[in-house]
Amino acid sequence: MSTLILLHSALGRTSGMDAVAERFALAGHAVHTPDVYAGKTFDAAEPGVAHAQEVGFSTLVDRVKDACEDLGDDLVFGGFSLGAALAQQMGKNDPRARGVLLFHGGGFPKPTRWQAGVPVQAHFAVDDSWRTPGTIETLMESAAKAGTQAEYFLYPGDSHLFSDPTTPDYREDSAELLYERALAFLDRF
């Protein structure tokens, strides 16, 4: 089974994140959930995003690197919203990356370098106001041009964190399909 590094959203490492991690662990995966906010959590996205901006993206990436330092090779990076941006960064640059799962975030505004042999799977609600049209397609094209599998899925509605069972955005039908697809992705490793 996979070693999954699961990175939280701008809300921080909440009970919802722990529930999601448990779901992957019950499927047999070794799941690590680094707290890149050092214990801070938020009830809404805006203050969480403000905190991330105050800390700085490069510092958050460094915290992920530090948390993964002793985990060995063959890591799958997954993340939710802000955590998807961190997972994407690790998948793009960490030589131990074997796969990337992006939930409710990710993408690039222009073509970029992607590691060969690091497949990526992304999940968004079609009318999510946090999704910038075209950026996920650019990431998929960049990964495919690197010779790796790249796929993304769109779900009905406008909910952002629709797979987090503790948020008002939660949509059980879409979340179940997302987890089914993500678990099938993890079974490849």
For every predicted segment, state its role.
Residues 79-83, 87:
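Gly/Ala-rich beta-loop-alpha elbow adjacent to hydrolase catalytic centers
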Residues 2-72, 161-166:
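Serine-hydrolase catalytic machinery in alpha/beta-hydrolase-like enzymes
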Residues 96-106:
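A conserved short beta-strand
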Residues 122-124:
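Short beta-strand/loop motif that positions the catalytic acidic residue
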Residues 71-80:
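Alpha/beta-hydrolase fold nucleophile elbow
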Residues 115-120, 147-149:
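Short, proline-enriched alpha-helix->beta-strand connector loops that line the catalytic pocket
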Residues 149-189:
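C-terminal catalytic histidine-bearing segment of alpha/beta-hydrolase fold enzymes
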Residues 127-132:
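Acidic catalytic loop of the alpha/beta-hydrolase fold
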